[in-house]
C-alpha cells in the first residue's frame, strides 16, 4: 500500500499504535451515555405513577430511588427521609425542592451531598433490582413426594413415582374377598 501511495505522490499514512485491551475496555465504559441527576429524577417520579409527568416526586418514589441507589442504610433511614420530606408540607415536590430536601438531609445526617447525588444518578433505571426464584417449602416437598404416600393413595403411583392413570384411581371389584390394595393376597395358606 505504501508503494501505491508513494507512486501517487501522497504521503504514506502513519502506522497506528496498538492499544491494549484494558484501555479499550475503559474507553468503551466512558462512551456509555451518562444519565444525569435530573433525568433520574424524571424517571423515578414517573415510576409507579402512570399519570405523572415527571416534574414532581412523592416520598415513596424518593424512598424507592434511595433504596435502589443504596443511599438508605444505617445512617440514613426512611424515617429520616419522611421527616425531612414533610418539612415541605406537600405530597409531591419539584426538582428544585428535592435538591433542597437532599441538602437538608445531608447536613442533618453529616453526609456529603455530592456523594448522595452521585449514587442517585448512577443507580440505573427504576425497577426491581433483584428477584429471587421461588423456593418450595418443606411442606410442599413432603406433600408431593409420592414415595411417602400411604393407603390407597400409594396405589395410584408406580415405583418410579409416575401416576398409573385411570387404573390407579378406579376401584375394580375382583371378587377375591380381599379389600382393594391388599398386597399379600393368597399368602395365608403358604404361612400355615
Swiss-Prot record:
This is Tubulin polymerization-promoting protein homolog. Residues 1-20, 151-192 are annotated as: Disordered. SUPFAM superfamilies: EF-hand. GO terms for cellular component: axon; cytoplasm; cytoskeleton; neuromuscular junction; neuronal cell body; presynapse. InterPro entries: EF-hand-dom_pair (IPR011992), TPP/p25 (IPR008907). Found in a complex with tubulin and Futsch. PANTHER family: P25 ALPHA-RELATED, TUBULIN POLYMERIZATION-PROMOTING PROTEIN HOMOLOG. Belongs to the TPPP family. Its main location: cytoplasm. Residues 152-161, 183-192 have a biased composition (Basic and acidic residues). Keywords: Cell projection, Cytoplasm, Cytoskeleton, Synapse.
Amino acid at each position: 500500500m505504501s508503494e501505491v501511495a508513494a507512486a501517487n505522490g501522497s504521503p504514506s499514512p502513519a502506522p497506528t499504535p496498538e492499544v491494549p485491551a484494558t484501555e479499550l475496555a475503559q474507553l468503551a465504559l466512558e462512551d456509555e451515555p451518562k444519565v444525569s441527576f435530573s433525568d433520574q429524577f424524571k424517571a423515578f417520579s414517573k415510576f409507579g405513577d402512570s399519570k405523572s409527568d415527571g416534574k414532581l416526586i412523592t416520598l415513596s418514589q424518593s424512598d424507592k430511588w434511595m433504596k435502589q441507589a443504596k443511599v438508605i442504610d444505617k445512617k440514613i433511614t426512611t424515617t429520616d427521609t419522611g421527616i425531612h420530606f414533610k418539612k415541605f408540607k406537600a405530597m409531591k415536590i419539584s426538582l428544585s425542592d428535592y435538591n433542597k430536601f437532599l441538602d437538608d438531609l445531608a447536613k442533618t445526617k453529616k453526609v456529603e451531598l455530592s456523594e448522595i447525588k452521585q449514587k442517585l444518578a448512577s443507580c440505573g433505571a427504576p425497577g426491581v433490582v433483584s428477584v429471587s426464584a421461588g423456593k418450595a417449602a418443606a411442606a410442599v416437598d413432603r406433600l408431593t413426594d409420592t414415595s411417602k404416600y400411604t393407603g390407597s393413595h400409594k396405589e395410584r403411583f408406580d415405583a418410579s413415582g409416575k401416576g398409573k392413570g385411570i387404573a390407579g384411581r378406579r376401584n375394580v371389584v375382583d371378587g377375591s374377598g380381599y379389600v382393594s390394595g391388599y398386597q399379600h393376597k393368597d399368602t395365608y395358606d403358604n404361612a400355615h
